[in-house]
Amino acid sequence: MGYEAGQYDVIVIGAGHAGVEAALASARQGAKTLVLTINLDMVAFMPCNPSVGGPAKGIVVREIDALGGEMGRNIDKTHIQMRMLNTGKGPAVRALRAQADKFQYQHEMKNTLEKEPNLTLLQGIVERLIVEDGECRGVITQTGAHYRAKAVVMTTGTYLRGRIILGDLSYSSGPNNQQPSIKLSEHLEELGFDLVRFKTGTPPRVKSDTIDYSKTEIQPGDDVPRAFSYETVEYITDQLPCWLTYTSPETHEIIDSNLHRSPMYSGMIKGTGPRYCPSIEDKVVRFNDKPRHQIFLEPEGRNTQEVYVQGLSTSLPEDVQQRMLATIPGLENVQMMRAGYAIEYDAIVPTQLWPTLETKKITNLYTAGQINGTSGYEEAAGQGIMAGINAGRKALGKEEVILSRSDAYIGVLIDDLVTKGTNEPYRLLTSRAEYRLLLRHDNADLRLTEIGHRIGLISDERYAAFEKKKAAIEAEKKRLHSVIIKPSPENQEYIRSLGGSELKDGVRGTDLMKRPEMNYETVTKLAPPEVPVPQDVAEQVEIQVKYEGYIEKSLQQVEKLKKMENKKIPDRIDYDAIKGIATEARQKLKNVRPLSVAQASRISGVNPADISILLVYLEQGRIAKIAE
């Protein structure tokens, strides 16, 4: 027997990194939102690494912030260390990474959800969806509560039929020994969704005061104040270091001699693990020529002794983990507080989704995060904000939002998932983005703040500050383009001191800045502005001027892509009626059901000849006799 428990615009299942962004995005747009989670003490919990950001991922956090999301603001308030990565490389691959106080991060994010006026936070286990006439109309919990909604977002993480594996021990569990979600997974199969089995792992945690830090290398944070959020004005200066050590030949020997006890090699683990975050067993076997592997010791917070042993992800038995740790410099006498483990879980095949993250099978049902086959908090949060935006907008009768591959890394991530699918936990990399010079850490606001403001997630006050910054960038570029730097003796001497060749004639400030030895700071010593320019404006001017040619080339490629994106494919096109398309391409097109010719061209197995035939049919207006 069930009972009617309430009516909402949007219900979010799960309150991990995808769930909190989905819920806040929905509620802040004006949709009455309910969040149901198995354990209220686990809101925004970090079951694996206590960090946010890194290559590509850090840019996603900036994009979430530019859209009006919460992850950037939250980590700025709760980090213990922050570093800019790849500073010696070009701006396209620079990214911020923060070590989190994982407990403070959780507390702060839960507090944010509790204070959100349009949002209700509730502990409960969802076991079934209410589906009527192919539409999701709500959820049913373990206690029989029926919650009705116009849209539902599933952000179930690694809880779906979760199973923890540690040596020869295996038991049903969510991450960190939380209760798993069994019946919801079975229900998804009943509804006809294709599920896959993935696996991830985590390393042991050790006690800080049993580490001999004198045998490790200190890894401090940056001295320069850093922030993910464009709104952050107060910076944490009291940072904690991380520490670097290495495995030893003895470590590898212990692993090799115990591979028969590893669930990965005994066949006990059936799920596919992440390629770019392998276990230590995998690293030792696959890279057996390497005498050692890096191990980073990362504090899990300011008020805990627990230290995360980054690089030692494992599911080997506890006794083997203890022996492994004792062979690592600095950890000879370490106390293991928690053993590492592997966790298997169900995910849906993501080609069953539209680019809005709504499922094709059931309307008004959205999915985001690890349920879609991704790995990583940032990838989850990026999907979460988009699913929350679109579920909220659909519930309110508004047009949904799709970010393209040239708009954001979030657009690349979602397009890869829904177009190509994934046969392993998907991790976002800079190499996955063909327009990465346009998708930089520094310009996320210029790319996405207008969208965030239009949909109601960016305040008018913040938008006015953004418009002021944009105007300042253009004004300074215009000034530097018009100013002529003359070949005076003083100027020539200064340029020579920087290792540059002398000026033959007067040169525009923008042209001088394009020289490799020059930057905004050096050029403005020769042609200073009347009023000092803010650092973020100066950085943007320098990048836009220095890389103008490359940026222009990328923008031309984007324009070509937009023409293909604008060639829409009707949803109910009958690919079987199009003669000449290869069998594999026909099957893939029917499965993915791309919305545009550009998306169709990105499907693996669909070649240019197939696209040409498809274009002919579309241009003739025949549309291959759309199937009824």
From Swiss-Prot:
A Pfam match: GIDA_C_1st
Cellular compartment(s): Cytoplasm
Stored Gene3D superfamilies: FAD/NAD(P)-binding domain (3.50.50.60), GidA associated domain, C-terminal subdomain (1.10.150.570), tRNA uridine 5-carboxymethylaminomethyl modification enzyme MnmG/GidA (1.10.10.1800)
Family annotation (NCBIfam families): mnmG_gidA
Quaternary state and interactors: Homodimer. Heterotetramer of two MnmE and two MnmG subunits.
Keywords noted in UniProt: Cytoplasm, FAD, Flavoprotein, NAD, tRNA processing
Stored HAMAP family: MnmG_GidA
Keyword ATP-binding: no
Positions annotated to bind FAD: G14, A15, G16, H17, A18, G19, V126, S181, Q370
Disulphide-bonded residues: none
GO biological process: tRNA methylation; tRNA wobble uridine modification
Keyword Cytoplasm: yes
Positions that bind NAD(+): 273-287
Functional summary from the UniProt entry: NAD-binding protein involved in the addition of a carboxymethylaminomethyl (cmnm) group at the wobble position (U34) of certain tRNAs, forming tRNA-cmnm(5)s(2)U34.
Record protein name field: tRNA uridine 5-carboxymethylaminomethyl modification enzyme MnmG
Family: Belongs to the MnmG family.
InterPro entries per UniProt: FAD/NAD-bd_sf, GIDA_C_N, MnmG, MnmG-rel, MnmG-rel_CS, MnmG_C, MnmG_C_subdom, MnmG_C_subdom_sf
Cofactor: FAD
Any single GO CC term annotated in Swiss-Prot or TrEMBL for this entry: cytosol
